[in-house]
Curated annotation (Swiss-Prot):
Entries under PROSITE patterns matching the protein: DNA_LIGASE_N1, DNA_LIGASE_N2
Reactions this protein catalyses: NAD(+) + (deoxyribonucleotide)n-3'-hydroxyl + 5'-phospho-(deoxyribonucleotide)m = (deoxyribonucleotide)n+m + AMP + beta-nicotinamide D-nucleotide
Its biological purpose: Catalyzes the formation of phosphodiester linkages between 5'-phosphoryl and 3'-hydroxyl groups in double-stranded DNA using NAD as a coenzyme and as the energy source for the reaction.
Oxidoreductase found in the keyword field: no
Enzyme Commission code: 6.5.1.2
Transmembrane segments: none
Family per similarity comment: Belongs to the NAD-dependent DNA ligase family. LigB subfamily.
Protein name: DNA ligase B
Keywords: DNA damage, DNA repair, DNA replication, Ligase, NAD
């Protein structure tokens, strides 16, 4: 299918000084779009933390939050007000602040971060809800939600009902502050195959709702920080395990370089785990004293997250493709995103009707994933731009019997027919892709789909963009095509039959084909009444008849008298 480029509308993009890709919006629109997205994130955030209900997938929320920060930086706006943290409803102070964790983009960033740091350990980045546990005189006295890192909600009554969280401790842990992740316990969770399951939202929902004590049995705890704990990591892990926090010991590995981090990351991505993860955290054994911990200032640890299964991508343009059958397909061009090491910059929306139902316009944010064989797939529209500037699709008068001859309105279907006849399903013209057909047609102005047979070697060689070797190859391919079987030439003319049906028919000439009745076609494999009728319509089409006579004049096998 070819792109109807003249009908495509899009938005322009420009690079900011920071290197981010920025929408080329007028100041007023930029301010409006930022405000709208900021408000939407705040609304989702409020519902999430007050009601324990996720109105949007965790990954989508995170990606749109990052998109908002990007837009704010593009226009030089302060990003401190971005609503990516919980609303401050709790007033219980953390005895030790939650620092958060810096995100590293790739292995190169991991190598750079590890350089100059020693005694490093890696842990899975468990996906759940962060909490502070305070033990005094051997008893759990307080449990505080992360909140803004300095203060949060008092979750003590709920946490006391979670069987997996020790209520008493001994030794060095009798008076200790622990930070960790409350997670949804899973049996044999394979992250690569099962994904995130919105685990964070499910945990938050359980902790927010009332009268759900039985549901809390499914929650677990992974301790990832013991402020002012033993400086020796093995000793720290051993004491945590003895106190009942065994997962920390099991899933904390010493690492010396980025290769070891990468191996652990890949192993946890593909192995069965008791929790959902979204990456790994690398941390130094040596940490500053707890009184120096501040939100956003934990430079002794960093995260390397897994790439999301689906990416939020910005639609940059809407384009229309017209295939050889005349079907109009809508394609969304995207600001490129990376999915499973694949650069995705367009996604097929399918028909005009489906596009209209999706209501997608340039500037919208859509969720894209990879379907079978790595084909990009549209999953949902996660954010719509205020401006709804949509292109007008081409007229829908195209069908399987149009555009065998070139015309101004037939350009795209005509090119699609050329690409088809050059494919292995028809004449098998090696090296003839869409770009080559466009170049030949633009230079030599084909009258119909077989006009290329009349080209001389000199004409092909003089086509702009064709090197000597390429033009000679094309000339050889065109000459070889003359020797192809009658069946392949009929396939090139887009007869509405499969090659197997044509072979079963046994026709070896145009004259034989003209003598066949509709009843004959119905009896062929995978050919019923409807398709047989289409064959008759195709055979009687004036353009097809004219092309058959032209091929006869070119002495193509099966078309002569």
């Amino acid at each position: 299918m070819r792109l109807w480029k003249s009908m495509a509308w899009g938005i322009l993009l420009w690079h900011s000084q920071s290197g981010a890709l920025c929408p080329a919006w007028p100041p007023a629109r930029a301010a409006e779009e930022i405000t709208r997205l900021q408000q939407q994130l705040a609304d989702w955030n409020d519902i999430y933390w007050k009601q324990g209900v996720s109105a949007v997938d965790d990954s989508v929320y995170d990606q749109l939050s990052a998109r908002l920060v990007q837009w704010q930086r593009c226009v030089g706006q302060d990003v401190s007000s971005t609503p990516v943290s919980p609303p401050l409803n709790g007033t219980t102070m953390h005895p030790v602040a939650h620092t958060g964790v810096r995100k590293l983009a790739d292995r190169q960033a991991v190598e750079q971060w590890m350089r100059g740091r020693s005694e490093l350990w890696v842990q899975p980045k468990v996906d759940g809800v962060a909490v502070t546990l305070v033990y005094q005189n051997g008893k759990l006295t307080r449990a505080i939600s992360r909140g803004n890192g300095l203060q949060g909600e008092d979750w003590t009554p709920k946490i006391r009902l979670i069987p997996s969280i020790p209520q008493t401790t001994q030794g060095a842990l009798a008076n200790a502050v622990l930070q960790g992740e409350i997670f949804l316990q899973r049996e044999g969770h394979i992250q690569q195959r099962m994904g995130g399951m919105n685990a964070r939202s499910k945990v938050a929902g359980m902790l927010m709702r009332q009268d759900n004590a039985s549901a809390l049995n499914s929650l677990g705890i992974f301790i990832w920080a013991w402020p002012d704990g033993p400086a020796n990591m093995p000793e720290r892990l051993s004491q945590l395990a003895k106190a009942g926090f065994s997962l920390t010991n099991k899933y904390t590995l010493a690492v010396k370089d980025a290769s070891e981090v990468e191996r652990a990351r890949q192993s946890w991505l593909t192995s069965a785990l008791p929790f959902v993860t979204d990456g790994v955290v690398i941390r130094m054994a040596k940490e500053p004293a707890s009184q120096h911990w501040r939100p956003g200032q934990g430079d002794w640890l960093a995260a390397w997250k897994y790439p999301p299964v689906a990416q939020v991508a910005q639609v940059s343009a809407i384009q229309f493709s017209v295939g050889k059958s005349g079907k109009i397909t809508v394609v969304a061009s995207l600001v490129p995103v990376i999915l499973d090491d694949k650069r995705v910059q367009r996604v097929n929306i399918d028909s005009v009707k489906r596009w209209e139902a999706w209501d997608i316009a340039p500037g919208d944010q859509i969720l894209v994933s990879l379907a079978g064989q790595g084909i990009p797939r549209l999953d949902e529209v996660v954010w719509r731009s205020r401006e709804r500037s949509k292109p007008v699709p081409p007229d829908s008068h195209f069908n399987s019997l149009t555009c065998f001859y070139a015309s101004e309105t037939c350009q795209e279907q005509f090119i699609s027919r050329l690409v088809w006849l050059g494919s292995r399903s028809a004449l098998g013209l090696d090296g003839m892709g869409e770009a080559s057909w466009r170049a030949l047609h633009q230079t030599h102005r084909f009258k119909h789909i077989f006009s290329w047979l009349a080209l001389t070697s000199a004409q092909i060689a003089n086509t702009p963009g064709f090197a000597k070797g390429k033009s000679e190859q094309i000339w050889r391919q065109f000459n070889l095509a003359r020797r192809q079987s009658f069946t392949r030439w009929i396939m090139a003319m887009d007869i509405p039959l499969t090659q197997a049906a044509l072979q079963a028919s046994g026709d070896r000439s145009w004259e034989q084909l003209l003598m066949r009745t509709e009843q004959h076609w119905r009896q062929l494999p995978a050919t019923g009444e409807r398709r047989a009728g289409r064959v008759i319509d195709w055979r009687n089409n004036p353009q097809i008849k004219t092309l058959s006579r032209w091929l006869a004049a070119q002495h193509i096998p099966g078309f002569g008298s």
